[in-house]
């Protein structure tokens, strides 16, 4: 809708995790280096955490698209699985077919991993949104981490999730799994206005923008403040701001448009937020209740009953 108006070939701020639009902050670069190192060197279990919207899934998809063909990846993005469902997913994704019981599956999986490892091939199991895994499934993941040769792990495991994943792994019942974590990575939000400006410019250029000053400097500053530096929040603000700017016929997105959008999505900095209707009504309700109580007491003291 607004793409042609702003000279864009496609929408630059879609919320889908399109690897083409990935922007590497120093934090993203560090996480990618750790993931690459963990997989290449056969470290075993890698844990990646980050706030909602910081780009965990985008990084995973970008990495999977660029892994060597010798790497077989099993990617599980639904953590709400029972143990049988989890193993069904693993067996399907890793092409292990002849099994009926868990012990048979583990035996066949071990043979398949050993065969691949002996031929110089690597196998990676990635579980996204892992903070939602049950303790029972996490214990099974610990068992899968036992597949190893004398020199390296035969199955690389990557768990990604929100910061709550760290709390889940601190469960005393999962201490054996926690002890097997070889690498921990944290994806951080964009740290400042300058990085936010580079992020916005990068996405505009990927979308075919002919000009990079669509967002005025003061609007970028306010976007950073409203978004807390989280890419998904930035995308949401920018996408809706471009739509509002198009509707208003504004070639440049100023701060006022960002303020309106942020207010609509309840993303204004706390100091600028208007109280909700309930909050605005609360003092009046308190006063009204107090007044009724005072009037009732006054009537009781004077003997009025009407």
Predicted regions and their residues:
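Trafficking entry modules
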Residues: 3, 9-13, 253-306
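Conserved NTP-binding/hydrolysis module of P-loop NTPases
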Residues: 10-13, 71-72, 81-100
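Walker A/P-loop nucleotide-binding motif
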Residues: 41-63
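Short regulatory helix/loop adjacent to the ATP-binding pocket of P-loop NTPases
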Residues: 62-66, 165-180
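Conserved AAA+ ATPase "SRH/arginine-finger" region at the nucleotide-binding site
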Residues: 76-80, 168-172, 182-195
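Mid-core helix/loop region of P-loop NTP-binding domains shared across ATPases and GTPases
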Residues: 82-85, 98-140, 149-152, 194-196, ...
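The conserved phosphate-sensing helix
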Residues: 120, 193, 227-239, 251-254
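Conserved small helical "lid"/interfacial subdomain of P-loop NTPases
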Residues: 189-216
